[in-house]
Amino acid sequence: MKATLVNRVRSTIDPRDNHPYLNGAWTPMFEEWDAEDLGVEGRLPRDLDGVYLRNTENPVHQPLGKYHPFDGDGMLHAIAFEDGKAGYRNRFVRTAGFLAEQQAGRALWSGLAEMPPRSERPGWGAQGALKDSSSTDVVVHAGRALTSFYQCGALYQLDPRTLEQHGPAQWHGAFPAEGVSAHAKVDAASGELLFFNYSKQAPYMHYGVVDRDGRLVHYRPLPLPG
């Protein structure tokens, strides 16, 4: 196996912090790696060709107040299989919030459990005070891995094999101002992406469809009586 350290991000998390969601299996990592020709127990089928993607919450900075695991910065892990071999790489999702906090060298937004919010800048999502960490979900559509935020935000695009970053999805200028919630689904037969979003202002929810080429073809409000 050959492993290469690609990058190490700047972190301010106090190693003495004993929060259960910052330790043990939840201990964050701050390095980005490429690893080729991973060691294998047994044998990988040579016709196994594809990528396994896993999204995680991986906080970088000491929280502003109470911490919830949903607050962690998005990180993708990828294991690629080809010709009987496997390779690994991981990358932070370069969201607007992640980049702003890297520049500031500290947390700028408080999290889900901190009420009232202590965020120092306007936030994203239905609540409007949180960082869009794009750490909740990942789905592959139109050749791109799309990461998303549980309270509605941008869909950040990455190459599913290399994890090269391509910024927020634009959908040819038609991306909804209300954002997109996590847990969009892809229709395996049509290649369409099916999604929803929600907000505190009427209309409170929308449903939409994006075709296999990344064009928004359907976007309608859903009535929510009461």
Annotate each predicted stretch with a short phrase.
Residues 1-124, 130:
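N-terminal regions that are enriched for targeting/export leaders
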